[in-house]
Regions:
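A polyanion-binding, active-site-adjacent surface
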Residues: 2-192, 201-202, 216, 226
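Short, aromatic/basic amphipathic alpha-helical patches
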Residues: 204-210
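Active-site metal-binding loops of divalent metal-dependent hydrolases
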Residues: 68, 198, 221
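Short, flexible loop segments at boundaries between secondary-structure elements
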Residues: 211-238
Length: 238
């Protein structure tokens, strides 16, 4: 494990955590569709930090990138962090997850003991377990991040994804997230970026347009994506 590299990834995550957190009041004010924003890098920093510490410095040269947190990372702090997979496969457990500073009653944060699964996370980490068997072996080849760390909702608690934002505050958020992505790619010496879904792939292409690497994509494994459900969830793996 490269401890110096890991510390650089950690510091970049801290910078993203703080800069995006500072932008939340502006996003709430300017984005009519946004009422509540969670920042898992803050309240779920303990498991996120454990994820960085254990897996960012093991030599991965492939970066898999999602769009922003969903139910999984929103509870566990780990990208695509289906609670079951985080505890049983990644063996990140018994760590305090605090509460978001603003809460929506339909989006309760329980933490690592959240009993509700996340299908996308179960599929992503389940596939990596099939391929590499252990999280340590996985992290020698692939490291996973999200482009944006914020989990965002309207007044009804419906998920609002980053591409639905508009205006100056949206551009500011994209810029912060693009810069973090570029930093992680440079720190880790990444040579392949896999966008999970079209949005992630397009942001990678924008953020990394001046870098010599391969950018590709896979279908998003969400059950909301028809491709992800074809052949009982097997099709998207190909």
């Amino acid at each position: 494990m490269d401890a110096d590299l890991t510390e650089l990834v950690r510091q970049s995550a801290i910078k993203l955590k703080n800069s995006c957190d500072n932008l939340i009041p502006t996003l709430i004010k300017e984005q009519d569709k946004l009422n509540v924003i969670y920042n898992p890098l803050y309240y779920a920093w303990n498991p996120h930090n454990a994820y960085i510490t254990r897996f960012s410095g093991n030599g991965a040269k492939i970066l898999m990138m999602g769009m922003n947190p969903g139910h999984g990372m929103g509870n566990t702090g780990v990208p695509f962090g289906c609670p079951e997979q985080v505890k049983e496969f990644l063996e990140i457990k018994n760590l305090l997850v605090e509460q978001p500073r603003m809460n929506h009653p339909k989006r309760t944060v329980i933490g690592l003991e959240q009993p509700k699964s996340e299908v996308s996370g179960r599929r992503i980490w389940g596939l990596l377990k099939e391929m590499f068997e252990t999280p340590e072996k996985t992290s020698e080849y692939i490291y996973i991040v999200n482009h944006c760390p914020l989990w965002m909702f309207n007044e009804k608690g419906q998920n609002i994804t980053p591409e639905k934002l508009t205006g100056k505050s949206a551009s500011q958020l994209y810029e912060l997230c693009d810069q973090h992505l570029k930093e992680v790619v440079e720190i880790m010496g990444i040579n392949v970026v896999i966008g999970v879904g079209n949005y992630a792939a397009s942001r990678a292409a924008i953020a990394l347009n001046d870098m010599d690497l391969i950018i590709t994509k896979i279908p998003h494994p969400s059950p909301a994506n028809p491709l992800a459900n074809r052949d009982k969830g097997e099709y998207w793996k190909n």
